[in-house]
């Protein structure tokens, strides 16, 4: 009674509270009224803006009279006109903004709670920034609406202040960033959280799609994996597995041919039985391999079957315990399978389950299970083991019994005879105890023939080691220094040494080329460029389209669109040839769909190379039309080759060398090769054209270049005496004098220079080609001294017959300096990474758009227009064939002074003096006396004492250091006087 009254009292109290709370207080009433007025005002503004008509009278204009078409009446027309004038297109968003503001005000806290002025201040600031930036962006990007600006007066004023300073792009970027800042100030939402939300949403969508794709397979995988988990407790889990298998059969509607044994049928369909089948096949294959190895070993050692079996059962041939355990498990599985074939259906199920567990090779097989299997083995299995004894008597009986036996028994027999490990593991089983009693004669054979077998094995090991050592020293794939090659009968190498490709038909699909031409015209028209294809020149690698531009179209517009054209035409790279010599057209080079390889044999067999008479003729490749392109190194006279790694630079240098080897004998051309990488040019070691060994030490490279400078000066002296201008005239005059019977002697010979009593005759001067494979490495190790030597050779060595081939993979300004570029006008540029590298090599762009693999730009001497060349390819076999051909003709005659550095004064650079002939300063003796007495060897002390300049004092101190009077400067700059002090009188 009391509880019921209490419940009634509580109900009355709650009802009274609900009645009191349903009424609004003063502040809540004000907020709700503001919400109603805000929604009403936004609806009125929407109607006025959507039904605005420019003909209505408004604040911007007066009307001639007539009806007002605005649904908001005259007031609506005035309001819409004012909003459009102030905000432009943004006026359409003001009703929505008004509704949002009133809703936020309606949802604010109660009047007794604290108002955060900082928060509301940032919100108002963000709202103002959003409105201003939105008006500015609308004014820039959208068309005007009626006679109003798209951004209103706010956008016009803002852009009029920003555009003169920031331009269009800068103003747009500034307004966008300001808009983002205003959005953050207004809403308090971080842009990082927006990015994270988008990323998580994308990942969720991807995960949902993947789960959707995998959804069909989940129902099949779950029941398949369940029997494996229950395999440890198999007797209890067997009914549950059978029930699940029956459900799967009903769902998949697979007909059961044997309804009496549904479990066996389902186990055949399980994927888990696939590794079991593979494992059995692997075991049998491995056993067959062991049997084959056993017979092969018996054949090699000339041993009988009995000796082979004794060796298999010997203790020395036993494998490790891990392999023994593994073999035992395989045999247990096989025995289980045999017993299963001769038992009931339930026994078949247990045997198959047991064989599945063997796959795991873990602690699955227990001793109790092994005992069960041993008890289940019946008499036929024992007969199989008993029949193994007669198989060891002779080989014929062994093969006959093996062919007639059943597969399972032969399998066990092979395992017994070839692997003693298996018998050792099964000896603990009840079945395997009888195996040891079957063949008691095996131990006697082992004791009698063990020593003889070990001797045979030791002899075979000794012979095999000797054969391996001989094969290691006589490997045909190694480079042989001294080879006796047959001397060729031809004076120069023949084309048979090079690789000759099969005859290729130059099939040109005219329809495809015309289609590409129309595509080029249409893509150029997309960029508002009117051009017409007037010529198509297909080549082995690229095809050039010649364009006739419309009047007023600049070539620079097409050059700036090269990357866009490559993207539009789905090409790897597009190169624009701005000027074609002799034609008023612009070239557009596109790569072919199928690229052809230009082989060295094709160019050497061409008339251009065959008709060339200069011994320094070099092969470059083929031009865009497929014509062979060769050049004369004597007219270049030096060439600079540059390109990134893998662009074909080293192959191009090898092609130049091989082409000169095809044209010149050692009497005509000699080489000095500098190879810092020790790989590219070392293959030419031993050819008779070399003046010195291939230089791989960079310290010797400067000596070789210095020798070239001395040889250049010597040749100039000889040519001045002969009255000729170049090496060609010198050799011709020598020949004329020899034919006339008046050979010319060395005019600079002096008595004592040699053991001869009369001056020697002048000989023919060969061309000298200096090849540097990696010029950047040489500059890095030796320094600027190499640059001075190369610059001197490049300036004066042309007439003397000395030519340079410089290759580098780092085409930077610190390697290819202005001094080198000014004296080497001929350049070859392979693919480079940037336009800056292309300008460093060629003084113009284009090399960055090449296709690689021998594609190059050739800048001939005396021209500023490059030629697109597809470099010839020479394989390593071609290089070795030509080199071996020249090695068979003779050996090189090296000049030791080239690398040793013993040159005369003519090889010194301007201003450089030899160390032995260096003149001492006239004050040297006085300075020595002063330094020895004062025990101070500073430059400033010498300068003050003798009143000379700093440079002269420093030079004298360096001479003192060279003579060993003072030491080198220490870490503090002081020098120690090494000479002893004079004795005191």
Swiss-Prot record:
Pfam families: FtsK_4TM, FtsK_alpha, FtsK_gamma, FtsK_SpoIIIE. The chain crosses the membrane at residues 35-55, 84-104, 117-137, 145-165, 174-194. ATP binds at residues 646-651. It is a multi-pass membrane protein. One of its GO terms (molecular function) is ATP binding. Keywords: ATP-binding, Cell cycle, Cell division, Cell inner membrane, Cell membrane, Chromosome partition, DNA-binding, Membrane, Nucleotide-binding, Transmembrane, Transmembrane helix. It comes from the Bacteria. One of its GO terms (biological process) is cell division. GO terms for cellular component: plasma membrane. It is found in: Cell inner membrane. Residues 195-985 are cytoplasmic. Signal peptide: none annotated. Disulfide bonds: none annotated. Belongs to the FtsK/SpoIIIE/SftA family. Homohexamer. Forms a ring that surrounds DNA. Consists of an N-terminal domain, which is sufficient for the localization to the septal ring and is required for cell division, followed by a linker domain, and a C-terminal domain, which forms the translocation motor involved in chromosome segregation. The C-terminal domain can be further subdivided into alpha, beta and gamma subdomains. The alpha and beta subdomains multimerise to produce a hexameric ring, contain the nucleotide binding motif and form the DNA pump. Essential cell division protein that coordinates cell division and chromosome segregation. The N-terminus is involved in assembly of the cell-division machinery. The C-terminus functions as a DNA motor that moves dsDNA in an ATP-dependent manner towards the dif recombination site, which is located within the replication terminus region. Translocation stops specifically at Xer-dif sites, where FtsK interacts with the Xer recombinase, allowing activation of chromosome unlinking by recombination. FtsK orienting polar sequences (KOPS) guide the direction of DNA translocation. This is DNA translocase FtsK. The lineage of its organism: Bacteria, Pseudomonadati, Pseudomonadota, Gammaproteobacteria, Vibrionales. The gene is ftsK.
């Amino acid at each position: 009674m009391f509880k019921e009254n209490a419940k009634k009292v509580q109900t009355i109290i709650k009802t009274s509270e609900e009645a009191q709370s349903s009424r609004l207080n003063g502040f809540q009433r004000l907020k709700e009224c503001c919400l109603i007025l805000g929604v009403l005002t936004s609806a009125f503004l929407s109607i006025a803006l959507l039904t605005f008509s420019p003909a209505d009278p408004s604040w911007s204009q007066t009307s001639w009279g007539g009806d007002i078409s605005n649904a908001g009446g005259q007031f609506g027309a005035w309001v819409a006109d004012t909003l459009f004038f102030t905000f432009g297109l943004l006026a359409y968003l003001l009703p929505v903004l008004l509704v949002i503001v009133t809703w936020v005000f309606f949802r604010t806290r109660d009047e007794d709670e604290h108002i955060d002025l900082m928060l509301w201040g940032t919100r108002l600031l963000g709202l103002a920034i959003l409105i201003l930036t939105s008006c500015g962006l609308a004014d820039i990007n959208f068309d005007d609406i009626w006679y109003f600006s798209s951004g209103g007066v706010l956008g016009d004023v803002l852009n009029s202040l920003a555009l003169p300073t920031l331009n269009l792009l800068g103003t747009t970027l500034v307004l966008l960033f300001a808009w983002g800042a205003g959005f953050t100030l207004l809403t308090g939402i971080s842009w990082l959280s927006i990015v994270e939300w988008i990323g998580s949403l994308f990942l969720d969508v991807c995960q949902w799609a993947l789960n959707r794709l995998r959804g069909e397979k989940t129902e099949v995988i779950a029941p398949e994996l369940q029997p494996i988990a229950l395999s440890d407790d198999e007797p209890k889990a067997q009914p549950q597995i059978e029930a699940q298998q029956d459900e799967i059969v009903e769902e998949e509607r697979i007909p059961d041919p044997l309804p009496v044994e549904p479990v066996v049928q389902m186990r055949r369909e399980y994927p888990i039985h696939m590794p079991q089948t593979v494992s059995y096949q692997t075991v049998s294959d491995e056993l067959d391999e062991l049997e084959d190895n056993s017979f092969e070993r018996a054949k090699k050692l000339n041993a009988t079957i009995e000796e082979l079996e004794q060796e298999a059962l010997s203790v020395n041939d036993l494998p490790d315990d891990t392999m023994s355990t593994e073999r035992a498990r395989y045999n247990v599985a096989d025995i289980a399978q045999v017993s299963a074939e001769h038992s009931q259906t339930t026994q078949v199920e247990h045997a198959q389950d047991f064989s599945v567990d063997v796959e795991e090779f873990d602690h699955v097989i227990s001793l109790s299970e092994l005992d069960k299997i041993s008890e289940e083995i019946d008499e036929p299995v024992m007969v199989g083991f008993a029949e193994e004894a007669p198989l060891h008597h002779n080989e014929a009986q062994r093969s006959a019994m093996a062919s007639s036996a059943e597969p399972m028994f032969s399998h066990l027999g092979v395992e017994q005879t070839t692997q003693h490990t298996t018998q050792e593991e099964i000896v603990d089983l009840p079945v395997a105890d009888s195996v040891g009693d079957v063949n008691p004669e095996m131990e006697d054979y082992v004791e009698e023939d063990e020593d003889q077998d070990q001797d045979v094995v030791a002899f075979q090991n000794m012979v095999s080691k000797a054969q391996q050592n001989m094969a290691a020293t006589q490997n045909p794939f190694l480079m042989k220094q001294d080879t006796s090659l047959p001397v060729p009968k031809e004076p120069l190498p023949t084309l048979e040494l090079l690789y000759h490709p099969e005859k290729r038909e130059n099939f040109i699909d005219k329809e495809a080329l015309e289609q590409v031409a129309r595509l080029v015209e249409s893509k150029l028209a997309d960029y508002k460029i009117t051009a017409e294809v007037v010529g198509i020149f297909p080549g082995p690698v690229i095809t050039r389209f010649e364009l006739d531009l419309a009047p007023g179209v600049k070539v620079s517009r097409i050059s700036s669109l090269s990357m866009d054209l490559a993207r539009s035409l789905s090409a790897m790279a597009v190169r624009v040839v701005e000027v074609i010599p002799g034609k008023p057209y612009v070239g557009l080079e596109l790569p072919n769909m199928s690229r052809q390889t230009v082989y060295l044999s094709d160019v050497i067999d061409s008339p251009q190379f065959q008709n060339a008479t200069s011994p320094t003729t070099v092969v470059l490749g083929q031009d865009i039309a497929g014509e062979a392109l060769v050049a004369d190194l004597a007219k270049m006279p030096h060439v600079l080759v540059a390109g990134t790694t893998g662009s074909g630079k080293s192959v191009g240098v090898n092609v130049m060398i091989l082409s000169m080897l095809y044209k010149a004998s050692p009497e005509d051309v000699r080489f000095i090769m500098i190879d810092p990488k020790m790989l590219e040019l070392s293959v030419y070691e031993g050819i008779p054209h070399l003046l010195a060994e291939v230089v791989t030490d960079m310290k010797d490279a400067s000596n070789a270049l210095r020798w070239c400078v001395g040889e250049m000066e010597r040749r100039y002296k000889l040519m001045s005496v002969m009255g000729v201008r170049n090496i060609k005239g010198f050799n011709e005059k020598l020949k004329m004098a020899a034919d006339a019977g008046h050979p010319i002697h060395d005019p600079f010979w002096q008595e004592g220079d040699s053991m001869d009593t009369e001056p020697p005759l002048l000989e023919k001067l060969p061309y000298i080609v200096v090849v540097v494979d990696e010029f950047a490495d040489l500059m890095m190790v030796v320094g600027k001294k190499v640059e001075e030597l190369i610059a001197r050779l490049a300036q004066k060595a042309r007439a003397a017959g000395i030519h340079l081939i410089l290759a580098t993979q780092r085409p930077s300004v610190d390697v290819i300096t202005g001094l080198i570029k000014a004296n080497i006008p001929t350049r070859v540029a392979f693919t480079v990474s940037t336009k800056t590298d292309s300008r460093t090599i060629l003084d113009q762009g284009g090399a960055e758009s090449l296709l690689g693999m021998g594609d190059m730009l050739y800048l001939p001497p005396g021209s500023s227009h490059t030629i697109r060349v597809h470099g010839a390819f020479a394989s390593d076999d071609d290089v070795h064939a030509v080199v071996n051909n020249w090695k068979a003709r003779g050996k090189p005659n090296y000049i030791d002074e080239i690398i040793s550095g013993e040159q005369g004064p003519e090889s010194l650079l301007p201003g450089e003096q030899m160390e032995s002939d260096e003149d001492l300063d006239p004050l040297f003796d006085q300075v020595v006396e002063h330094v020895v007495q004062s025990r101070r060897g500073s430059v400033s002390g010498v300068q003050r004492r003798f009143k000379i300049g700093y440079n002269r004092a420093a030079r004298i101190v360096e001479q003192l250091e060279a003579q060993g009077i003072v030491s080198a400067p220490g870490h503090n700059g002081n020098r120690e006087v090494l000479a002893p002090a004079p004795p005191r009188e």
